[in-house]
Amino acid sequence: VDLFHDCVKDLSEKIAKMMGINSRIKRMDSLMIEANIRNLSRIELLYSCVARAVKYHHGNHTGIDLSGLEHYTDPDDQNLVIYHSRNIDVDVRTATIINDAEILLDRCQGQYGHVKEHQLLLRCLEEQTVIDDNGKRRLRIKGEESPKPTSLQNPTDPEATFSAKAGKKHIGYAANIVEAVSDGGSVIVDYQYEQNIYSDSR
């Protein structure tokens, strides 16, 4: 139940009545709502998901073996891996992170599927990687195997989606609004959010 939506709708109807606006005459419009999140590169996204899962086990003392993965709990580790290791090819660093993800999941043996951090890690791997003919997991090739617009953009806001409009990239949501209109003015009487996944071509 969205209590905020119910409250806004109720107040809007009362305002429309007070202004003498005929609620039977309505018009609809849509707008894009930008999510308050960073636009992550693929290596940043994968790192963030692995780090969150490792930190979950470290912070909750689950007993999962984190040997070799301890560095993900260091607050400075992300900057070191992502920004201060440019002498190491980004594909090599990304492959290492993917391998770390598989190591962690293998050690967990499917026991933590109910944990949000694990759900996001599994989703990220499914959307950003594929298993090659040799049985090895690798990053999807841009263009040929690009993730869908509905893919995870940032683990801090899992529902935010991607679209390209007017030559610009947007990460967030689409809002559909219903406006009651009359000679005395107008007021928004209802709204809803949906995934912002359609480009200009759609």
Where are these regions (language model features)?
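Polybasic low-complexity intrinsically disordered regions
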Residues: 1-202
